[in-house]
């Protein structure tokens, strides 16, 4: 379980979220860079093209989870299958990295909307808990049923 959490923290680092704690007197303003079913309006490339205007008014941009959701082409990021593959309904990993760099160069940060317990399996035998093994920097990670919250219906129903 520790490896999973360490991996998740690494994922956040990849997205360049590097807060050292939230300052009590923070006066910044955050823009929610997406809305439900806003796939075309919230494409990474489209948000990047608006960086000059957004950077004038906002300090942070809140974006949806960028993890790959398998066969789901229109997914708001709440059914990730692969944590380490950053291709999603909003764009590719390269587009995501380019967008983050553009905003970072203008002094704007990002917050990714990630819920660890929102995870989807690869769909073998129509199961949503057949989580794939993933390898990152030579380390392989594999979630199982024991990694689901103990009061989740899947864990309690066996």
State the predicted function of each range.
Residues 1-4:
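Positively charged n-region of N-terminal signal peptides that target proteins for export
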Residues 6-16:
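Bacterial N-terminal signal peptides
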Residues 21-52, 56-158:
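Substrate-binding/active-site clefts of carbohydrate-active enzymes
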